[in-house]
A protein has these predicted regions:
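Conserved ABC transporter NBD signature motif
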Residues: 17-28
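Conserved ABC ATPase "signature" region
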Residues: 28, 80-99
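ABC ATPase NBD coupling module
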Residues: 29-46, 64, 72, 78, ...
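A short, proline-enriched helix->beta-strand linker immediately N-terminal to the Walker B motif
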Residues: 123-127
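A short, surface-exposed alpha-helical micro-motif characterized by mixed small hydrophobic
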Residues: 171-173
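Short, glycine/charged-rich "phosphate-handling" switch motifs in NTP-dependent
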Residues: 177, 189
Length: 236
């Protein structure tokens, strides 16, 4: 879950208590020094969070936010950093990347903001990408586009990806292996197809059984009206 993932690179608040063991490429992460964790964050392990507006600075342009990471981790400055930022935006499917560099987060759609977050996560060539419910705040169409993008990046760049989600349909679609967690502990794990076809744990079995299947029964023409709405608007 997100708390476990955040504890991996020491991103929990100071009053959090971390127990157990997390090993990454032979390195013990729980209890590691801030210096060692800082070397891993962004370089080896990057995060994509559920709501990009909570991660992007509303006062800074997209260019500044991407280039800040490039400067901090790679020492890129000026035109070199700008060229790399444009490459990253093109890589994640942002149209008119050069023009978008000067945009601020509020000027982008939800899908575009999430693509910017993915670009920032990829900026320093991480080996592991931790995606925490990255499509929950998006509509179904944009959600599918982001999932396709992540799958494509995983295949082309050889990324390992830890995808945190409660959506079983997404698990089926994107995961090679699945871990089922209850109360912060893994109760079952294995190849996705095997776990879905033959769940073993008493928690996993009803969880998968609750997944909607088939099509709902058609509504009869004579069925009573349950709810109606007129002149309904949604705005942000």
């Amino acid at each position: 879950n997100p708390v476990t993932a955040l504890s991996t690179v020491g991103l929990l608040s100071d009053n959090a208590i971390g127990e157990g063991s997390v090993t990454y490429l032979g390195r013990q992460m729980i209890g590691a020094s801030e210096r060692d964790l800082r070397a891993v964050r962004g370089n080896d392990i990057s995060f994509i969070f559920q709501e990009p507006m909570t991660s992007l600075n509303p006062l800074h342009s997209i260019e500044r936010q991407i280039c800040e990471s490039l400067s901090l981790h790679q020492g890129l400055e000026g035109d070199n950093a700008r060229r790399r930022a444009i490459e990253l935006l093109n890589k994640v499917g942002i149209r008119n990347a050069i023009e978008r560099l000067t945009a601020y987060p509020h000027q982008l759609s939800g899908g575009q903001r999430q693509r910017v977050m993915i670009a920032m996560a990829l900026a320093n060539g991480p080996e592991l990408l931790i995606a925490d419910e990255p499509t929950t705040a998006l509509d179904v169409t944009v959600q599918a586009q982001i999932l396709d993008l992540l799958a494509d990046l995983k295949a082309k760049d050889g990324l390992s990806m830890l995808f945190i989600t409660h959506d079983l349909a997404i698990v089926r679609r994107i995961a090679d292996r699945v871990c089922v967690m209850k109360g912060g502990e893994i109760v079952e794990s294995g190849p996705t197809a095997e776990v879905f076809a033959n769940p073993q744990h008493p928690y996993t079995q009803p969880l998968l059984a609750a997944e909607p299947k088939g099509r709902p029964d058609p509504v009869a023409d004579t069925a009573p009206e349950v709810i109606s709405a007129e002149n309904l608007r949604v705005w942000f």
